[in-house]
Amino acid sequence: MENRWQVLIVWQIDRQKVKAWNSLVKYHKYMSKKAANWRYRHHYESRNPKVSSAVYIPVAEADIVVTTYWGLMPGEREEHLGHGVSIEWQYKEYKTQIDPETADRMIHLHYFTCFTESAIRKAILGQRVLTKCEYLAGHSQVGTLQFLALKAVVKVKRNKPPLPSVQRLTEDRWNKPWKIRDQLGSHSMNGH
């Protein structure tokens, strides 16, 4: 019998991001209860030795599964060390991979308190409008003029700690140059 290969898209991330992601998920699952029905699977609950953890996020009748891996191919730098994450959408027996932006949008629409375009209609009709959004990155598209006006009126309140974001987990910070503040007293930073 021949070998059967299975290809999986895995975003390479550093170990600290995996720790931060797991910490945020556990905080909002057990402390704030915003993610109370999310399921967290530890590495010892998986049959795959490369799986570090898996978070099952129910969205309607399906699940978004965010799986973190360890012990993958070594990265270009020491901090890469072969950690990665994959994101799947599962409905019964059907599975497909999705990108982090789509996953965040689906999670945002289902879990986070948010004013949406329906808030414009509610405001015009004089009904009560939810005045906050816990995940502003979910509104990355250009909105209507009324929606932008409503966003201008609503005060932004930051959550401490932030809600878990798949997009933030997979963002590529390695290829972006580091921004180091130039301090007058620091000679080692600017080479003088």
Curated annotation (Swiss-Prot):
| Annotated stretches, region: Interaction with host APOBEC3F | 14-17, 74-79
This protein is called what?
Virion infectivity factor
Query: Keyword Ubl conjugation on this protein?
Result: yes
Q: How does it assemble?
A: Homomultimer; in vitro and presumably in vivo. Interacts with viral RNA and Pr55Gag precursor; these interactions mediate Vif incorporation into the virion. Interacts with the viral reverse transcriptase. Forms cullin-5-RING E3 ubiquitin-protein ligase complex (ECS complex) by interacting with host CUL5, RBX2, elongin BC complex (ELOB and ELOC) and CBFB/CBF-beta. Within the ECS complex, Vif interacts directly with host CUL5, ELOC and APOBEC (APOBEC3F and APOBEC3G) substrates.
Q: What does this protein do?
A: Counteracts the innate antiviral activity of host APOBEC3F and APOBEC3G by promoting their ubiquitination and degradation. Acts as a substrate recognition component of an E3 ubiquitin-protein ligase complex: mechanistically, Vif hijacks a host cullin-5-RING E3 ubiquitin-protein ligase complex (ECS complex) and the transcription coactivator CBFB/CBF-beta to form an active E3 ubiquitin-protein ligase complex that targets APOBEC3G and APOBEC3F for polyubiquitination, leading to their degradation by the proteasome.
Q: What post-translational modification information does the record give? A: Processed in virion by the viral protease. Highly phosphorylated on serine and threonine residues.
User: What else is noted?
Assistant: Vif-defective viruses show catastrophic failure in reverse transcription due to APOBEC-induced mutations that initiate a DNA base repair pathway and compromise the structural integrity of the ssDNA. In the absence of Vif, the virion is morphologically abnormal.
**What cellular-component terms does GO give this entry?**
host cell cytoplasm; host cell plasma membrane; membrane; virion component
- According to the UniProt record, where is the region Interaction with host APOBEC3F and APOBEC3G? 54-72
Similarity comment: Belongs to the primate lentivirus group Vif protein family.
Region (Membrane association): which ranges? 171-172
Write the gene name: vif
Residues bearing Phosphothreonine are 96
